[in-house]
């Protein structure tokens, strides 16, 4: 077991660390903003007037992306359902609304492309350091498992990770079952596992699963976006996370 030090906080008897992907290891702001804008435009082309409300729901305002907004933290299925709800408000039936939303997300995905965004500065070094210390490491993301696997492959992270877990069907964050399943897959107890993420959902999930601790990351110095964290850092201070 290892002691993890992050800023002035120490976590003792740690066996594993789970990382979120978007906004934690991956600087995905530009990708997510472009994706949300494309989805909104495609749906607005079919249902005029719905584009702007959808952008607001996604957490997009011009060039600003809210890291706590829907497109930043929700799973693919949650995003489809949220978009469909806005469509259904116009009087369309639920299944028609869901079909329009799913098609828009699929086509927007193809338009924007699946190439992962760059790693945040310091992310690779942290993974390397913690791996050398003998810790089990994994990604636990609200993105699909395929997106997680593509991210790991493109950035050549497989040597450092023992788990690549996304959300395909079933529960999403902040349901603690995701954290518990990840710990089970790694063969570690939740009480010996840290969660590193950039959303309240990450913190709630880990706390409800009785994790050893929660490390919150914020792009813009908004500690309320990671409420519940034991310690808060920003991406450029990633090097503060050491075994």
Features from the language model and the residues they span:
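Conserved Lys-Pro-Asp/Glu-containing loop-to-beta segment of HAD-superfamily phosphomonoesterases
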Residues: 174-200
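A metal-dependent, Asp-based hydrolase signature
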Residues: 52-108, 124-129
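Conserved small/polar residues in nucleotide/adenosyl-binding loops
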Residues: 239-243
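Acidic, Mg2+-coordinating phosphoryl-transfer loop and its flanking beta/alpha structural elements
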Residues: 195-231
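Short acidic capping loops at alpha-helix termini that bridge into adjacent secondary structure
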Residues: 13, 159-163, 190-194
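Conserved phosphate-coupling serine/threonine residues in phosphotransfer and NTP-handling enzymes
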Residues: 24, 141-143
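Active-site neighborhood of HAD-like aspartate-dependent phosphohydrolases
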Residues: 2-60
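Short, acidic loop-to-helix structural element flanking the phosphoryl-transfer center
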Residues: 73, 77, 111-139, 146-149, ...
